[in-house]
C-alpha cells in the first residue's frame, strides 16, 4: 500500500462543524509529522492555520492523498478536479447522507490513522464527460461522478428529444428530462426517478427518463463504454439545461446535441478496511435489517 506523506485538505465552506473537524484533522496529521496542505478557499476562513496553501487544481500535483471534509457534494466537486491526477481521495462526513464520505467525525483519528498505516481499500469510480454541441461546435463541457441530467430549467414544460447509443437510434421521448448516471450516481437522483441501484464495481451506465409521457418509458442499463447522444428537438420552444452533478450547468437550444461517455481518468476513492457497500445502503437508504434483529 502507498505511504502518504503530503496530505491535502478540502472542506465545505459555510460550516463551523467542518472548520472544527479540519482543526482536529490538522492537529492529528501534524502530530504524525506529515506535510499538510490546505485548499486556499478553506484557508481564508481558518485564521492562524500556519500551513501551506494551494488551489484545488494544484493539490492534485503536490499531494499523495487528499482528505475531503464535508458531504457527498463536497466530494463530488473534489472528484471532478482531482480524477485527472490519479490521486487517492478520502472523505470525512460532515454532510447529510454520506454515501461517499464514510468516516464519521467521532472516529476521525482511529480511521485516518489506519489509512495512514496502510490499512485501507481503494475503489476506482469512473466519471462521465458531457459535451453540448450546436451546429457542430462545442458550447459546453463538463464532468460528473454521479450524473449528467437534461432538464427544463426554470420552465415547467416537457422536453422532446431523441436518444442514440453508439450511433444506433434507441427512441424519441417527451419527458421532464433525462438522467444519465454512473453506478456511483445510481443511488442519487437516478434512484429518486425510479432507476436501479448498481454496485460501484459495475462497468455500466443507466439512462433514466424523468416522468416520461408514456407508459413504456423505463430505465435502461448499457455498457459503461457506450457513447450516448441526446438530440434536443428542433421544434422545442424552451431552452433546457444540462447539469453535471447538479453543480455545473449549460443552457441548450432547440436542435443541440449532448454527448455523454466515460471519462478516461477515474477517481481513486479510499475506504477504511471493513467498508461494506450493502451496509452503507442499509444505513443510508433505510433498508431492513436481519429478521429477529440479528446484526451478525
From Swiss-Prot:
Alphabetized UniProt keyword annotations: ATP-binding, Cytoplasm, Kinase, NAD, NADP, Nucleotide-binding, Transferase
Its EC number(s): 2.7.1.23
Top-level EC class as recorded in UniProt: transferase
Pfam families: NAD_kinase, NAD_kinase_C
Keyword Endoplasmic reticulum: no
Listed cofactors: a divalent metal cation
Residue positions binding NAD(+): 72-73, 146-147, 157, 174, 176, 187-192, 247
Active-site residue list: 72 (proton acceptor)
Alphabetical list of SUPFAM superfamilies matching this protein: NAD kinase/diacylglycerol kinase-like
Cellular component annotations (GO), alphabetically ordered: cytoplasm
InterPro entries: ATP-NAD_kinase_N, ATP-NAD_kinase_PpnK-typ_C, NAD/diacylglycerol_kinase_sf, NADK
Subcellular location: Cytoplasm
One Gene Ontology MF term: NAD+ kinase activity
Tagged with keyword ATP-binding: yes
Family recorded in the similarity comment: Belongs to the NAD kinase family.
Protein known as: NAD kinase
Species whose genome carries this gene: Pseudomonas putida (strain W619)
Amino acid at each position: 500500500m502507498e505511504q502518504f506523506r503530503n496530505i491535502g485538505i478540502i472542506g465545505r465552506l459555510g460550516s463551523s462543524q467542518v472548520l472544527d473537524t479540519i482543526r482536529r484533522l490538522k492537529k492529528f496529521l501534524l502530530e504524525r509529522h506529515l506535510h499538510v496542505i490546505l485548499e486556499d478557499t478553506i484557508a481564508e476562513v481558518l485564521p492562524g492555520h500556519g500551513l501551506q496553501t494551494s488551489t484545488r487544481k494544484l493539490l492534485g500535483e503536490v499531494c499523495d492523498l487528499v482528505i475531503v471534509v464535508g458531504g457527498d457534494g463536497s466530494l463530488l466537486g473534489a472528484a471532478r478536479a482531482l480524477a485527472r491526477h490519479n490521486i487517492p481521495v478520502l472523505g470525512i462526513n460532515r454532510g447529510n447522507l454520506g454515501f461517499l464520505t464514510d468516516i464519521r467525525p467521532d472516529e476521525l483519528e482511529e480511521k485516518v490513522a489506519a489509512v495512514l498505516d496502510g490499512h485501507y481499500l481503494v475503489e476506482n469510480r469512473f466519471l462521465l464527460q458531457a459535451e453540448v454541441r450546436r451546429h457542430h461546435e462545442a458550447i459546453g463541457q463538463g464532468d460528473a461522478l454521479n450524473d449528467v441530467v437534461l432538464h427544463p430549467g426554470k420552465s415547467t414544460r416537457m422536453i422532446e428529444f431523441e436518444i442514440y447509443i453508439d450511433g444506433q437510434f434507441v427512441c424519441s421521448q417527451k419527458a421532464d428530462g433525462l438522467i444519465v448516471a454512473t453506478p456511483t450516481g445510481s443511488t442519487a437522483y437516478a434512484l429518486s426517478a425510479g432507476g436501479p441501484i448498481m454496485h460501484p464495481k459495475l462497468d455500466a451506465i443507466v439512462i433514466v427518463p424523468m416522468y416520461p409521457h408514456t407508459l413504456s418509458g423505463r430505465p435502461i442499463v448499457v455498457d459503461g463504454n457506450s457513447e450516448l447522444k441526446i438530440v434536443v428537438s428542433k421544434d422545442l420552444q424552451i431552452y433546457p439545461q444540462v447539469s453535471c452533478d447538479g453543480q455545473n450547468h449549460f443552457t441548450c437550444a432547440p436542435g443541440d446535441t449532448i454527448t455523454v461517455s466515460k471519462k478516461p481518468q477515474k477517481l481513486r476513492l479510499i475506504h477504511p478496511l471493513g467498508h461494506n457497500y450493502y451496509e452503507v445502503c442499509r444505513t443510508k437508504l433505510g433498508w431492513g435489517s436481519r429478521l429477529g434483529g440479528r446484526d451478525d
